[in-house]
């Protein structure tokens, strides 16, 4: 929609109009409402229209997967395997950190026990 913003009278007696065209578009979907309701930003990205088959057989046969549905399932399987792999690495890192912490504590204790000991009559007093 074009709006006439200004009308200018020129010295020659002609009327000239300057037009301003808006280049930004308003969002058609209320994103704040969708976020508050826990819905995805794009309503076509997830839901029964995208996840369920387009048709079903009346005799109960399974419906073949659509091309995008198959790609989506493969992508989700890749993500799931990556999650399992990374969680395993995280558990390994936690156990390794705990082993290193215990080893450092025992090394510190060993160093303290091997320090110089008192000699002579001080050593004899400690044994009693």
UniProtKB/Swiss-Prot annotation:
Q: Which UniProt keywords apply?
A: Mitochondrion, Ribonucleoprotein, Ribosomal protein, Transit peptide
A single MF term (Gene Ontology): structural constituent of ribosome
- Main location class: mitochondrion
GO biological process terms, semicolon-separated: mitochondrial translation; translation
Query: For this UniProt entry, what's an example GO CC term?
Result: mitochondrial large ribosomal subunit
- What residue range does the UniProt record give for the transit peptide? 1-28
Q: Where in the cell is it found?
A: Mitochondrion
Pfam families xrefs: MRPL52
Which family is it part of?
A: Belongs to the mitochondrion-specific ribosomal protein mL52 family.
Self-association or partners: how does it assemble?
Component of the mitochondrial ribosome large subunit (39S) which comprises a 16S rRNA and about 50 distinct proteins.
PANTHER family for this protein: 39S RIBOSOMAL PROTEIN L52, MITOCHONDRIAL, LARGE RIBOSOMAL SUBUNIT PROTEIN ML52
Q: What is this protein called?
A: Large ribosomal subunit protein mL52
The organism named in the record is Drosophila pseudoobscura pseudoobscura (Fruit fly)
